[in-house]
UniProtKB/Swiss-Prot annotation:
Database matches in InterPro entries: Znf_C2H2_sf, Znf_C2H2_type
Function: May be involved in transcriptional regulation.
Principal subcellular localisation of the protein: nucleus
Name of the molecule in the record: Putative zinc finger protein 702
Organism of this sequence: Homo sapiens
Keyword Lipid metabolism among record annotations: no
Gene: ZNF702P
Zinc finger (C2H2-type) stretch: 34-56, 62-84, 90-112
Similarity section: Belongs to the krueppel C2H2-type zinc-finger protein family.
Length: 129
């Protein structure tokens, strides 16, 4: 195994080749050189552009082996699988209610805080979700 002699000054991560170090540094610089030819959105890594492109193509390469539902992103499939297992790892510190998704907990938490971050552009009314 090669020694990791290339270290990023920003993140502290070490790499065994200079090309990986350069990729890490590009992330910190915010350089965005990969542009979507459909909507113009730009990304700092080619793989993020490829992931984004799925929203235009509708590609969903990740399939749940229990129900057949498909997803564009692996992370979405992982979150979905909690539905089948019944796992609810996200617990409200205020009332103890549990949720299978972090986003559902965040939405629920706004009931306790009264936060209403969503605003209707038509009538300016605000909502918690």
């Amino acid at each position: 195994m090669r020694e990791k002699s290339f270290q990023c000054n920003e993140s502290g991560k070490a790499f065994n080749c200079s090309s990986l170090l350069k990729k890490c540094q590009i992330i910190h610089l915010g350089e965005k050189k990969y542009k979507c030819d459909i909507c113009g959105k730009v990304f700092n890594q080619k793989r993020y552009l490829a992931y984004h492109h799925r929203c235009h193509t509708g590609e969903k390469p990740y399939k749940c082996n229990q129900c057949g539902k498909t997803f564009s992103y692996k992370s979405s499939l992982v979150i979905h699988k909690a539905i089948h297992t019944g796992e609810k790892p996200h617990k409200c510190n205020e009332c103890g209610k549990v949720f299978n998704q972090k986003a559902y907990l965040a939405s629920h938490h706004r009931l306790h805080t009264g936060e209403k971050p969503y605003k209707c552009e038509e009538c300016d009314k605000v909502f918690s979700r």
